[in-house]
Amino acid sequence: MRNSSENNKRIAKNTLLLYCRMLFLMAVSLYTSRVVLNALGVEDFGIYNVVGGIVAMFTVLSGSLSAAISRFITYELGKGNQDNLNKIFSSAVTIQLGLAGIIILLAETIGLWFLNVKMNIPEIRMGAANWVFQFSILTFAINLISVPYNASIIAHEKMSAFAYISILEAIGKLTIAFLIVISPMDKLIFYAILMCLVAIIIRFAYGNYCKRHFSECTYHFIWDKQLLKQMFGFAGWNFIGAASAVLRDQGGNVVINLFCGPTVNAARGIAFQVNNAVNQFVTNFMTALNPQITKSYAAGDKEYMMTLIFQGARLSFYMLLLLSLPILTNTHYILELWLKIVPEHTVLFVQLILIFAMSESISYPLITAMLATGKIRNYQIIVGGLQMMNLPISYLLLRLGFFPEIVIIVAICISQCCLAARLILLKKMIGISMQKYLKKVYFNIIIVSIIAAIPPCISTYYIDESFVKFTIISLLAAICTISSIYFIGCNYQERQFIQQKLSSIKSKITRK
């Protein structure tokens, strides 16, 4: 593996670029959600979320291959094998085109039947729901074909392009939010049409960039049986993991609709908007880190790989904790400040989904390491099998009369079971030390979280809800979290590194 310091700098640079993108996207996304919710109303907002969720369930067929495409492209770059890259890219596009056709067929038969026969949608809005369904299918197919292009950008670590195109997408969605307010037709249908149009524009933006900058990203129809066998072999087992994640997220959304109706789907949809905005911090960091984990494995540098896994897990959690704690202690006030309409159940949904996101965050580097090995059969059978339990358990509990938030509580519990399974399996696959992981990551983040959370949580009971309370509690949460991370969460070398960086920044400011 090349100089670790150089690789770390690349990770830092790419993370910084993605953070600049993220801050803009987060602000735009949250404001867009407010405008869209108020323009559509709670019921239509919930309908759009759950109908889109039906289409998203078909990603079970594509998600596994998407991971395979990313892994194969990144792995070949790590080995420096340029000759094989175009074969992989062209094969990937061919596969995605075929899958798009299969998914459209399934959606127009099984999906359409489920929407019209089983879904809990008011009769008066069923016509609009069907239009949303059609445009959601088209949008999904377009995004599916974009996967090989996105994978190439990330594998080449060209995060500036990824950032700029994502910003273009966010601006498009913000424009849509304002346009639906003055819609000349049914607002829900108009919204679905415009979202599809944005997907088409972004698809061409990714394709144009890749063709200009990466020689392998020129599509030729290739039918290499050996390569396709390798990719499908990898994807076949990864299918279990992809299916379990889709069934957990979108299946849970559909189950909530069956028992609780579209207004609760709206509450869950808002919670996931908050989660997506906050989770962008970790997503951006892992997008920059993932190629280095895969490339270090391909180059045989397992020591550097382990360092990345441990540090990546802790940093992922700390980023989420720093953002989530102020929201967890001020959820009701933030939602009222952000939205004019706050659907019932939204507060608890938001709090639970943030806890779930933190629970999942420490597994991201482990998942990347597993994918890097290519030996995923046992992993996917066990971990994917555990995740698949989300849907039947949630269905059973809702049928027994439990509150809708139980779906997220089930997901949190199973997430912890999956973490344990990942560690046991990866000990055999890559030799990861469970004791080191528990000591350096798991127990570390638990202690940091408890110490950081106690002062702001206690303070919430002694200050009346207001902007002053929001400001005080948020500042207190930030100070406690940063202090806990620095003094407890960081080791000596990491504290020294932080001190050096702060001294460097101070010196530059003083010279000016």
Model-derived features: where do they sit?
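Helix-loop junctions and terminal segments of transmembrane helices
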Residues: G63-K79, A155, F214-S215, A271, ...
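Interhelical loop/hinge segments that connect adjacent transmembrane helices in multipass membrane
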Residues: M1-I11, L188-L194, Y206-D249, Q292, ...
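Membrane-interface helix-loop junctions in multi-pass transport and translocation proteins
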Residues: L37-A39, E43-D44, E157-S160, I171-F204, ...
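Signature of the first transmembrane helix
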Residues: K9-Y75, I104-E108, T139, K173-L174, ...
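Membrane-interface junctions at transmembrane-helix termini in multi-pass inner-membrane proteins
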Residues: L138-L168, F178, I189, L354-L386, ...
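Transmembrane helical elements of multi-pass membrane transporters/channels
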Residues: K13-L30, L194-K211, K225-K295, R314-S316, ...
